[in-house]
């Protein structure tokens, strides 16, 4: 009833998620929830709804995605998301290794957000995603393709594709021989990968 005047899409109703279209912009609205057990680095099949906002926000992937809004208290930001948003930083909530091992797709989501928003990836988060990039082998090609397409269309794509090339080599190993491999041509100043 809160969004009765808006177009709503049941995008994940069994997980408590609906998409509300406001002024042409789709916004995901989610009920407070706790995740079940992560199995094989995949999101839990079951969630438990909760009234504990802090517990819900603490299981989110990145600080910029771990904020909430309340009419009574306005923005609820327990993990520094507003500061990271202002400073254009992608940072995991809590331990990056834990976040990426809970859901491998978060590795590509970090790169995609950094590319789309032209943000930097915080150092511990960057080190962890490079260390854990082999987890990407667990993700379906369709899910990888969806994230990769959004990544390459971002404002910061060139920087992300260059700085995090080893992550891409996990999903597109054909690119690795091009990296740091010159054209042997005086008219090309870039290596084959960068070109």
Predicted regions and their residues:
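Catalytic cores of the polymerase beta-like nucleotidyltransferase superfamily
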Residues: 1-195
């Amino acid at each position: 009833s809160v969004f009765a005047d808006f177009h709503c899409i049941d995008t994940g109703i069994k997980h408590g998620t609906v998409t509300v279209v406001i002024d042409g912009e789709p916004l995901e609205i989610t009920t407070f929830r706790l995740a079940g057990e992560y199995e094989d680095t995949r999101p839990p099949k079951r969630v438990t709804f909760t009234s504990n906002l802090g517990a819900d926000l603490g299981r989110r992937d990145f600080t910029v995605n771990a904020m909430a809004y309340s009419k009574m208290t306005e923005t609820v930001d327990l993990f520094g998301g507003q500061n990271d948003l202002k400073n254009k930083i992608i940072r995991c909530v809590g331990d990056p290794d834990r976040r990426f091992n809970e859901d491998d797709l978060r590795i590509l989501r970090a790169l995609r957000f950094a590319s789309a928003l032209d943000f930097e990836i915080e150092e511990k988060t960057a080190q962890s995603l490079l260390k854990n990039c082999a987890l990407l082998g667990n993700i379906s090609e369709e899910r990888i393709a969806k994230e990769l397409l959004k990544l390459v269309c971002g404002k910061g794509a060139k920087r992300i594709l260059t700085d995090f090339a080893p992550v891409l080599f996990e999903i597109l190993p054909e690119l690795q021989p091009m990296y740091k491999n010159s054209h042997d041509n005086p008219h090309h100043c870039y290596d084959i990968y960068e070109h």
